[in-house]
């Protein structure tokens, strides 16, 4: 370490660096910048601000390649949330963020405060929150620990969202052993702008007052940002001070107080206190505004006695915000919050010099360059593997010829001379918790509060929310916002680039399946340690795939979150990384919600078609669709292997365009994309959603029948069409294909029936014959059965 007398400190540097998650190189860099050593409080501030959670030091160079501009983009990355222009004077703020590590330690509060934090990102921009979604990952539901994590997380999300009065309208949940002990909790929020001007976070106005509003500051959440930037270990279980405690009723008042304050026009800048608390809010506001901030901790409302400057600055107590307001308007603004029972005090002022100066007990305890804390932060350089890791190459060598033979009867297992018939296989897939109904989860959420939810969870491929006029909430509007979260983590684990492409493509396809036009993306990159060459390779390749897909599908990235070090220390000293999980949150706009389509069949006699990639045997034999990386492969053979198919993005774009045009023209009555589980599971899900049966006749195939039934990939959508519209839609597609020099297929599959049976024939031979009641029971009972049996055992 530095030995000059000018750099003497009154603390053990090595122990302090370990606690703050900093390296010796970081410490030397800090000293060089300051021309002195930092005191212990200042070192803590650098620890949180230079963590991956706050400054993206391992991922920033990769994120810079994302497309971030477009004709509808008003605010991109760098602010609390992205904002898009919806036309007709309406603007939407939206963002996704993670709360993974806190949820692993304290699932209820970790998930609840994750919801509270993402809501603050939205209303800090001047938007009223209108919807929540979540993307969750857990280990298998065969251990009390994983069941407890699921129950705690879902209860926390439900508690906060329900109490604050914002509907949780959609999401996705998947299960894999890699998430055991390290669940993923990603929360997404949407809000409609209520203010004329978008409220930004950059401070300005020398000597303008800085106002603290919201809850009091306590010792909860100490060092949460640093905690979120390291792996989970056994010691983390005792790190409960790093988990915050939220109050949704207080947040409800904060929403109203903020929107009222913003509408006065006297708020110059606003920043919520999330990760790193006061440290992050004041340093980011100063750095973004090119000014400084002086903060007097003696004026900050405290929840506990004898708090140190370190504790004040690193506390992550919830429901707090920092404002810069015009001089002379302090009381006017503060009264907006006091009437809601909230704290509101002037705690500082804007400085001309670009520094963060903190006073505690009448002494200056912090004097740091704002840019060094929040803008000019370190970037870790990693060598990118030139070739895929060896185990990935081995997976890519797999092909379908290694599987047992199949026939009309089912799969023939030679080793024990048994046949698993197609009915049994379908029921097994529908019982997979990742595929099965999530009703046990979403029934705990209030998804109808605010009375704007048009498509609720479990009904359509994306959530759909009515856009009401801000000035007149009683006036109906025909326009709506579609929203979805997606990530095929099994695909990403086997090919991060192709898996990330598929995540964007599927999210966009889901938006299109309800009739909405995809507009923009917010992403949540959940990965393991970037210091592991494989972990960094996965992150880099996934970012490349996301960028490619967003460019082609014209869905710019407006911001998001990076969550690294998602791995669990095992008793044997090894580490268990999660499957790489780049979650894509996407929003879209529909002009007429009355034309929106759901996934369930509508009427007996409607005809069922497969739109997009053909089921022609010649297509089945190419790389567009495959049994590699499928749910079928994992559930029936216990294999997670193969190389996922590559989505043809240009073809995908055209399929979605034709789908949306057909929905808008009322040519299609239902739409459901084919993804997890393949064609037959997609058909089954539409039967379950509607309660109606089907009789389908699929083409005979020379090679593998299971590929026809369960392959994944391609750009494929199941649609149902009234017999009266068959000629019109075929004629429309023919003209579309000619105009675009493309061959989008439209394969007839069968008919919707009212006999309540799920029947599929091959060359007039019935291979699948199940009652809709039977497949529904299997689908609906999967998660509750596992939870109940694990609790009992």
Swiss-Prot record:
Sites where the protein binds Mg(2+) 1: 97, 561
Keywords: ATP-binding, Cytoplasm, Ligase, Magnesium, Metal-binding, Nucleotide-binding, Purine biosynthesis
Example GO biological process: 'de novo' IMP biosynthetic process
HAMAP family: PurL_2 (MF_00420)
Keyword Ligase part of the UniProt annotation: yes
Key word tRNA processing present: no
Protein name: Phosphoribosylformylglycinamidine synthase subunit PurL
Residues given in the record as substrate binding sites: 98-101, 120, 244, 316-318, 563
Catalytic activities: N(2)-formyl-N(1)-(5-phospho-beta-D-ribosyl)glycinamide + L-glutamine + ATP + H2O = 2-formamido-N(1)-(5-O-phospho-beta-D-ribosyl)acetamidine + L-glutamate + ADP + phosphate + H(+)
Binding site for Mg(2+) 2: 121, 272
Active site (UniProt): 53, 99 (proton acceptor)
InterPro entries membership: PRibForGlyAmidine_synth_PurL, PurL_linker, PurM-like_C_dom, PurM-like_C_sf, PurM-like_N, PurM-like_N_sf
Binding site for ATP: 56, 95, 523, 560
Location, primary (coarse class): cytoplasm
Molecular function, one GO term: phosphoribosylformylglycinamidine synthase activity
NCBIfam families assigned to the protein according to its UniProt record, in alphabetical order: FGAM_synth_II, PRK01213.1
Record-stated family: Belongs to the FGAMS family.
Record lineage: Bacteria, Bacillati, Cyanobacteriota, Cyanophyceae, Synechococcales
């Amino acid at each position: 370490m530095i030995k000059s007398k000018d750099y003497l400190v009154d603390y053990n540097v090595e122990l302090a660096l370990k606690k703050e998650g900093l390296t010796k190189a970081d410490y030397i860099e800090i000293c060089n910048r300051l021309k002195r050593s930092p005191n212990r409080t200042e070192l803590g501030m650098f620890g949180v601000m230079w963590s991956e959670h706050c400054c993206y030091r391992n991922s920033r160079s990769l994120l810079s390649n994302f497309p971030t501009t477009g004709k509808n983009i008003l605010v991109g990355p760098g602010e609390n949330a992205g904002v898009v222009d919806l036309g007709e004077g309406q603007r939407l703020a939206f963002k996704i963020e993670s709360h993974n590590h806190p949820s692993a330690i304290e699932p209820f509060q970790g998930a609840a405060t994750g919801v509270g934090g993402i809501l603050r990102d939205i209303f800090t921009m001047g938007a009223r929150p209108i919807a929540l979604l979540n993307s969750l990952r857990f280990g298998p539901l065969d251990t009390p620990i994983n069941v407890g994590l699921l129950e705690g997380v879902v209860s926390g999300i439900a508690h906060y969202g329900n109490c604050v009065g914002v509907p949780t309208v959609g999401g996705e949940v998947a299960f894999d052993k890699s998430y055991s002990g390290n669940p993923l909790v990603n929360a997404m929020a949407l809000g409609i702008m209520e203010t004329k001007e978008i409220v930004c976070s950059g401070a300005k106005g020398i000597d303008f007052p800085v106002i603290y509003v919201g809850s009091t500051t306590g010792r909860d959440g100490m060092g949460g940002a640093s905690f979120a930037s390291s792996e989970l270990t056994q010691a983390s279980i005792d790190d409960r001070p790093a988990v915050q405690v939220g109050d949704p009723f207080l947040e409800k008042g904060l929403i109203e107080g903020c929107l009222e304050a913003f509408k006065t026009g006297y708020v110059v800048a606003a920043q919520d206190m999330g990760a790193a608390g006061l440290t992050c809010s004041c340093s980011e506001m100063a750095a973004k505004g090119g000014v400084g901030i002086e903060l007097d901790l003696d004026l900050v409302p405290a929840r506990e006695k004898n708090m140190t400057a370190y504790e004040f600055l690193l506390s992550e107590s919830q429901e707090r915000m920092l404002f810069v307001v015009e001089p002379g308007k302090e009381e006017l603004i503060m009264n907006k919050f006091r009437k809601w029972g909230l704290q509101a005090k002037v705690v500082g002022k804007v400085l001309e010099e670009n520094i963060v100066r903190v006073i505690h007990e009448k002494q200056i305890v912090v004097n740091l360059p704002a840019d060094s804390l929040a803008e000019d932060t370190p970037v870790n350089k990693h060598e990118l593997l030139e070739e895929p890791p060896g185990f990935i190459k081995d997976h890519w060598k797999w092909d379908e010829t290694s599987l047992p033979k199949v026939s009309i009867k089912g799969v023939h297992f030679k080793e024990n001379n048994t046949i698993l018939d197609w009915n049994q296989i379908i029921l097994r897939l529908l019982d997979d918790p990742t595929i099965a109904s999530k009703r046990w989860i979403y029934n705990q959420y209030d998804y109808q509060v605010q009375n704007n939810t048009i498509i609720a969870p479990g009904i359509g491929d994306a959530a759909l929310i009515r856009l009401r006029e801000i000035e007149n909430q009683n006036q109906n509007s025909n326009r709506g916002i579609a929203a979805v979260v997606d990530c095929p983590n099994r695909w990403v684990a086997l090919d991060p680039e192709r898996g990330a492409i598929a995540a964007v493509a599927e999210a966009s396809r889901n938006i299109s399946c309800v009739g909405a036009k995809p507009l923009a993306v917010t992403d949540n990159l959940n990965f393991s340690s970037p210091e592991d060459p494989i972990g960094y390779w996965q992150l880099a390749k996934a970012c490349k795939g996301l960028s490619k897909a967003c460019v082609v599908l014209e869905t710019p990235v407006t911001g998001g979150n990076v969550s690294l070090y998602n791995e669990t220390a095992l008793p044997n000293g090894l580490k268990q990384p999660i499957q790489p999980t780049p979650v894509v949150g996407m929003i879209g706009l529909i002009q007429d919600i009355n034309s929106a389509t759901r996934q369930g069949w509508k009427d007996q006699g409607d005809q069922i078609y497969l739109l997009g990639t053909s089921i022609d045997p010649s297509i089945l034999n190419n790389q567009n669709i495959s049994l590699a990386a499928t749910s079928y492969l994992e559930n029936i053979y216990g294999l997670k292997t193969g190389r996922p198919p590559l989505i043809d993005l240009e073809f995908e774009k055209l399929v979605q365009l034709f789908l949306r045009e057909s929905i808008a023209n009322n040519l299609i009555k239902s739409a459901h994309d084919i993804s997890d589980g393949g064609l037959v599971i997609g058909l089954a899900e539409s039967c379950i959603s509607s309660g109606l049966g089907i009789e389908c006749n699929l083409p005979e195939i020379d090679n593998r029948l299971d590929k026809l039934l369960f392959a994944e990939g391609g750009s494929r959508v199941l649609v149902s069409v009234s017999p009266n519209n068959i000629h019109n839609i075929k004629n429309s597609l023919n003209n579309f294909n000619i105009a675009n020099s493309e061959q989008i297929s439209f394969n007839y599959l069968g008919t919707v029936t009212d006999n309540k049976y799920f029947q599929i024939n091959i060359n007039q031979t019935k291979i699948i014959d199940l009652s809709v009641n039977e497949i529904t029971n299997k689908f609906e009972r999967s998660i509750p059965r596992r939870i109940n049996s694990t609790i009992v055992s």
